[in-house]
């Protein structure tokens, strides 16, 4: 059995999202039909990222399994012949049979477009959010500066989210502006991160629309982030303005991962995970952490290390060493005493 990875582009206007559901036509449904027509096999595709009804994609990633011996590159053209015109395969390649698009470290980039003018443009209506009020893009840029880095983004998450935790890392966010021939301006919010919560980008965009139009000050963004309360943020902006631009998968681990914000600061040493040893470990140093975040922080990092191949995680707390004790449970991981610079070791109790 072979596993084929697809880079998929689609106009989401006519679809009820990417994931198969009982009511409504979806991107996944059309891809499944095309794969079955081509291969004669029922092999459901798995998307790396799910998109909602009306949301578009330039570079979503999907995989499917097949016994067909066609060269991987030819699947691009063969599937496109069997897909509607608003869905296109941009590239296809073979990947290891155990490669799973949702279990990889990656960088996702979304773009959100806002058409700002007195009169809507019919040519932009399906791919941008229309805004009548004049928007101050400089205030919008000021507002997003606090969002970069690792934070708890619970305030920008809809209630229907099934996420285990609401901490994400934003690598970069920029707001661009360009003139439109028909008049007005097209504002593009480009945001890259380790992952995004349900409706996260659209709620950030909805909050920025309020800031740009003067309904609330730019300083509100940081207050919203700190409060961690969805009620404080703006509305969910329209789906038509959102496009999943790309998903880039990490080829190798970084030597160190660190994070610093008002609530926590840590450094995670991953060099041993890259060394290819039979028994590999990661080394976590906690410099400071608010009590409300401590349990979740350690649980999340222990699980991240395990997923990246660590047999255990050695940990030290330089702020309050007494917070760690033998037998403490962090999800599936239990602390036991260790020797040396890192006095504690966490191992998965499920194995």
Where do the protein language model's features map onto the residues?
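Structured-RNA-binding interfaces characteristic of tRNA pseudouridine synthases
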Residues: 1-269, 275
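Active-site/acyl-donor-binding loops of N-acyltransferases
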Residues: 239-249, 265-295, 299-351
